Amino acid sequence: YVTNEWYGEYGAGTDHDLVKLMQQYPQIIQVSGHSHATLEDARSIDQSLGYTSIQDGTIGAYFENESGKVDPITGTAATRPADSELASQGLLVDVYRDGTVKVHRMNFATGTWIYPDEPWTITADGAKANVYGKNRPSTPAMFPDGASVGFDTAKTTGNSAAVTFPAAKPADGTNNNMIHSYRITMTPKNGGETVYKSAFNDYYYAKAGVGAAGAVPTQKSR
């Protein structure tokens, strides 16, 4: 977080612009604490401002992501995904003699690595290459053949409706192709205003039976 709220002792104002100061040093790697976003989200690293920003997850509190989503059970506004309390993540940072930095993401709840084949890699030039910018290549996910949307009439009221649908399948297992959320569009049959709702996907769920609770992942080979 490098916003007007988080200037720390550097102070606020045009003479104390923390972003402009950090942009003079593209090799900076700024890590934000007190963060609850999921480390599976590829956007947890960003270089679009001219330096590297990383959010480091939560060790033992709860997941909380961006606003604009709804709870899939109640339909109310939600920033916390389902079972958000199943959260314990962190980072292992390796710094090499040539100046290269590799950041490995860990799930402490299961003792496993998060995208183990995709460590975030920052060269000695830092953010100049903007590898982790706003625009990153990805391939759309697909729903299974014959997939359809279900409609639960028993749970339908004058201002709400319950729908079900099968999970989509990502194009592959790479981080940029992770399915982050679903957007549901509903338009009245006889015309009227279209309603849009979004809900988080369960991409942050650890695989059942993998690892041990509270364990640190086995050391990666160098």
Give a label for each model feature.
Residues 153-162, 219-221:
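Ser/Thr- and Asn-enriched, surface-exposed coil loops between beta-strands
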Residues 94-100, 156-159, 188-193:
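A short, structured loop/turn motif at beta-sheet edges
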Residues 39-143:
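Binuclear metal-dependent phosphoesterase catalytic core
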Residues 167, 177-222:
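Recognizes extended acidic, P/S/T-rich segments that occur
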Residues 158-178:
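Conserved aromatic anchor
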Residues 131-157, 172:
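Extracellular ectodomain segments of secreted/surface proteins
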Residues 1-32, 39-48, 214-218:
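Active-site-proximal segments of metal-dependent phosphoesterases and phosphodiesterases across multiple
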